[in-house]
Curated annotation (Swiss-Prot):
Keywords: Disulfide bond, Knottin, Plant defense. Belongs to the cyclotide family. Bracelet subfamily. This is a cyclic peptide. The presence of a 'disulfide through disulfide knot' structurally defines this protein as a knottin. InterPro entries: Cyclotide, Cyclotide_bracelet_CS, Cyclotide_sf. One of its GO terms (biological process) is defense response. It comes from Oldenlandia affinis. This is Kalata-B5.
Amino acid sequence: GTPCGESCVYIPCISGVIGCSCTDKVCYLN
């Protein structure tokens, strides 16, 4: 639920390495 300050429209979340995932074109952490 916390925005990771990253979008994932064209590329996956780089912040995925710390647990962020793509939701509605924005990377979120829980």
